């Protein structure tokens, strides 16, 4: 496995969700897995995927452990908003209309002021990237009156396999950055993904409109837990994720957002 430089998160490091999705596909065909990142993932370097059996695999850079994946044991279809979300431990927020998510994305602080983004070159959510150069263009913004951030996502054909479904690594990448934006507010130091657990529920199809949301779940010591969901146009969850984030060592806090830019839950994140 080689992570191409265009799939970066922080500078010179692979996007955690993208890498996690690639590794998850080695333990579960649908990408239902938990991936733990043990060290920054280098770009343009040949890495080795080693199956450990029993639905487990590791990613190695030479002899160094980079990441490890475990398949989720139970897969459920969602029949109501309260079913099948054991990954989060609680029901997710209600879905958001695409028009509302689109407007929230336009209000996103990093989209208005790139200095608010710790990694503006991130291929998923960086303001310096976009669909024209292979970026996903997902920059969630605050929804008035709700403790979550959202953006619309219309994945292009280039992200899909032959069946028209968006490949696992790109769905994971979208969930990764949505959760990060939802939980880690301006004023906090930059955080990086440590662990991501994803349960795919329905196909994500290229060319269709989706809503991606992220929100704060909990803060424990240095760690922040974030939830994220990709909703389809019917308001049903296509994929749900739980992410654990860790502060980047030695990083300075980000600039504060202008008044009104942060969601209602921002104070809890601080």
Regions found by a protein language model. Name each.
Residues 1, 54-58, 70-164, 263-270:
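Non-catalytic linker/capping segments at the edges of enzyme domains
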Residues 4, 52, 72-74, 154-156, ...:
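Solvent-exposed residues in well-ordered beta-strands and their adjoining turns
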Residues 7, 11, 19-54, 176-211, ...:
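Hydrophobic beta-strand-centered segment that forms part of the acyl-chain substrate-binding groove
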Residues 137-148, 161, 168-182, 187-189, ...:
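Conserved mixed alpha/beta catalytic, RNA-binding, or beta-rich assembly cores of soluble enzyme
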């Amino acid at each position: 496995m080689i992570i191409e430089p265009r799939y970066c998160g922080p500078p010179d490091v692979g996007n955690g969700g993208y890498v996690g999705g690639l590794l998850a596909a080695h333990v579960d065909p649908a990408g239902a897995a938990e991936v733990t990142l043990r060290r920054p993932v280098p770009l343009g370097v040949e890495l080795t995927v080693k199956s450990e059996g029993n639905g487990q695999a590791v990613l190695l850079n030479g002899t160094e452990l980079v990441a490890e994946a475990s398949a989720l044991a139970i897969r459920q279809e969602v029949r109501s908003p309260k079913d099948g979300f054991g990954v989060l431990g609680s029901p997710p927020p209600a879905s958001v209309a695409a028009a509302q998510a689109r407007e929230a994305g336009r209000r996103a602080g990093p989209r208005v002021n790139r200095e608010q983004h710790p990694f503006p070159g991130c291929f998923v959510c960086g303001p310096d990237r976009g669909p024209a150069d292979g970026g996903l263009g997902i920059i969630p913004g605050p929804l008035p009156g709700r403790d979550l951030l959202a953006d619309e996502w219309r994945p292009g054909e280039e992200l899909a396999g032959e069946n028209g479904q968006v490949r696992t690594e790109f769905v994971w990448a979208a969930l990764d950055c949505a959760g990060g934006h939802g939980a880690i507010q301006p004023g906090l130091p930059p955080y990086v993904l440590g662990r991501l657990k994803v349960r795919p529920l329905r196909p994500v199809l290229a060319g269709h409109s989706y809503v991606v949301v992220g929100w704060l779940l909990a803060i424990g010591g240095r760690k922040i837990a974030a939830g994220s969901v990709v909703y389809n146009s019917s308001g049903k969850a296509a994929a749900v994720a739980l992410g654990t984030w860790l502060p980047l060592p030695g990083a300075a806090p980000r600039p504060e957002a202008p008044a009104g830019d942060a969601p209602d839950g921002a104070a809890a994140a601080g």
